[in-house]
Amino acid sequence: MRTLVILAAILLVALQAQAEPLQARTDEATAAQEQIPTDNPEVVVSLAWDESLAPKDSVPGLRKNMACYCRIPACLAGERRYGTCFYRRRVWAFCC
């Protein structure tokens, strides 16, 4: 019985440790969405991506000619997700 309680406590600590970074990302996304003006007729697009996923310059000219789009619900075949777009209070996939 005591072993079961200890294992449950360890599991809860591990889950809480994993949930904290996710909460920080959620807070950043919420803050980005709150900054979007609703009365402005211009289109406002907010992009967020992970720099570690960005394509490297190992192939010359790759980044110059690469086309990226914000898509819902996911990237098309042959594209890779590099981050998130926030547009009109919706979350889109940033695909290249």
UniProtKB/Swiss-Prot annotation:
Pfam family, one: Defensin_propep
PANTHER family (UniProt xref): ALPHA-DEFENSIN 1 (PTHR11876), NEUTROPHIL DEFENSIN 1-RELATED (PTHR11876:SF19)
GO biological process assignments: antibacterial humoral response; antimicrobial humoral immune response mediated by antimicrobial peptide; cellular response to lipopolysaccharide; defense response to fungus; defense response to Gram-negative bacterium; defense response to Gram-positive bacterium; disruption of plasma membrane integrity in another organism; innate immune response in mucosa
UniProt similarity note: Belongs to the alpha-defensin family.
Natural source organism: Macaca mulatta
Protein function: Has bacteriostatic activity against Gram-positive bacteria S.aureus and L.monocytogenes and Gram-negative bacterium E.coli and antifungal activity against C.neoformans.
Subcellular location as annotated: Secreted
Positions of disulphide bridges: 68-96, 70-85, 75-95
Lineage, broadest ranks: Eukaryota, Metazoa, Chordata, Craniata, Vertebrata
InterPro entries tied to this protein: Alpha-defensin, Alpha-defensin_C, Alpha-defensin_N, Beta/alpha-defensin_C
Cellular component aspect of the GO annotation: extracellular space
Predominant cellular place of this UniProt entry's protein: secreted
The name this protein goes by in its record: Neutrophil defensin 3
Signal sequence region: 1-19
Keyword Secreted: yes
Source organism superkingdom: Eukaryota
Chain residues in the propeptide: 20-66
Keyword Ribonucleoprotein in annotation: no
Alphabetic keyword roster: Antibiotic, Antimicrobial, Defensin, Disulfide bond, Fungicide, Secreted, Signal
